[in-house]
Amino acid sequence: VDNVYEPTRDFCDKILVGLGITTTYYPPTTGAGIKDYIQPNTKVLFLESPGSITMEVQDVPAMVKVANEHNVMTMLDNTYGNGLHYRPLEHGVDISIQAATKYIVGHSDVMMGVAVANKKYWPTLRENSYLLGQCTSADDAYLALRGLRTMGVRLNQHEKAAIKSKTDAKKSHS
């Protein structure tokens, strides 16, 4: 997706290119029109909803449907959906990732990510994670648990602030 988180774009443009893998970016509001971007060699449809830069929400079910019709795996960066507000696997996404640093940990003192997959892709995800040496230290796990204890309170405050912001914006435009 075109509004993808900058380090993800850099990964595609700098590292994947070196491995002979090409990336095609598409507008986040493409929806079912994603079929026009799928090529015979497309392996993964990467979504980010809401998007990091513009907060645009993608039509995930429509895009997953098209991807499935073309035998393309779907992966969604669910950092802002955080698993409580949006559950990608329930909408057909194959792999969901998120930066645990943001909402799960919540204190910016741990660098951590989370990946979950459906039954089809879980064995591959688990094995590749192991082969790449990805693991969490005991200290980071402890700090993540600390963040989980306050996550509900923090997200409730985020929600209240967002509603107030929208209400205030509507009043100022009336």
Functional labels for PLM-detected ranges:
Residues V1-A169:
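Conserved PLP-enzyme active-site core in the AAT-like
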